[in-house]
A protein has these predicted regions:
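Structured-RNA-binding interfaces characteristic of tRNA pseudouridine synthases
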Residues: 1-239
Length: 239
């Protein structure tokens, strides 16, 4: 399992320019094992999105224990990527296909400018948000639905767009808010789209009923903006 500061990378998945988190970890593993090692992540994160608990697996022989492997890999990584744990997995384990769900959270600051040290890791909304209205909107989105309207349309073709969103809650106090989303899976940019819709509710641009109507329509509208990547964290992968 690893964590990373998404600002430095072009997302999780391997990129032609070699700037993805996957590319950097694979180069490090190549140095450790003296051969090519392909890793398989639990899923993609976009450029600028952070992770606290990204899970990946790879197949390679190692006889020196998990602690030494962790140390060997970590020593070759930049400070913006941390290997948090290493363990031997069952032979049939797959980081993506064995997962039964994921938890993301999104950080918001509202009602003024965010602290400059917080700004790189949150969406700073100038207007003070109506948090109770946002919570009402979140309740209307929770459950098993077709979330096509809350995904990037150019990435949704014949893909099954029905997901079980078991939790969408807003916590925090004062100017700092956290939106936590838990589901059996997420569509491309789904969490950021949900957050964008909830912020629109908080700003008075949408009502909770209108958010539900967008969900039922299955059609994305300009009223649903995609929240900036910098506030999103992959918190945990559930197995």
């Amino acid at each position: 399992m690893c964590a990373y500061d998404g600002r430095d990378f072009g997302g999780w998945q391997s990129q032609p320019d070699g700037r993805a988190v996957q590319d950097i970890i694979e180069r490090c593993l190549r140095s450790v094992f003296k051969r090519e090692v392909r890793i398989h992540g639990s899923g993609r994160t976009d450029a600028g999105v952070h992770a606290l608990g990204q899970v990946f697996h790879f197949d390679a022989g190692w006889r020196h224990g998990a602690a030494k492997l962790l140390a060997a890999v970590q020593s070759g990584l930049p400070r913006t990527i941390q290997i948090r744990s290493v363990r031997q997995a069952p032979r049939d384990f797959h980081a993506r296909f064995s997962a039964r769900g994921k938890i993301y959270f999104y950080q918001l600051h509202h009602g003024g400018r965010a602290d400059p040290f917080l700004h790189p890791f949150c969406w700073s909304v100038h207007q003070k948000l109506d948090v109770e209205s946002m919570r009402a909107g979140a309740q209307r989105l929770t459950g098993r639905h077709d979330f096509r309207a809350f995904s990037a349309l150019n990435r949704v073709g014949k893909e099954d767009t029905v997901r079980q969103l078991s939790r969408l809650e807003i916590t925090g106090r004062g100017a700092r808010l956290r939106v936590t989303a838990e589901a059996d899976g997420f569509l491309y940019k789904m969490v950021r789209s949900l957050v964008g819709a909830l912020v629109a509710v908080g700003e008075g641009k949408l009502t909770p009923a209108e958010v539900e109507a967008i969900l039922r329509s299955g059609r994305r509208t300009h009223a649903v903006q995609t929240a900036p990547a910098r506030g999103l964290f992959l918190a945990r992968v559930l197995y």
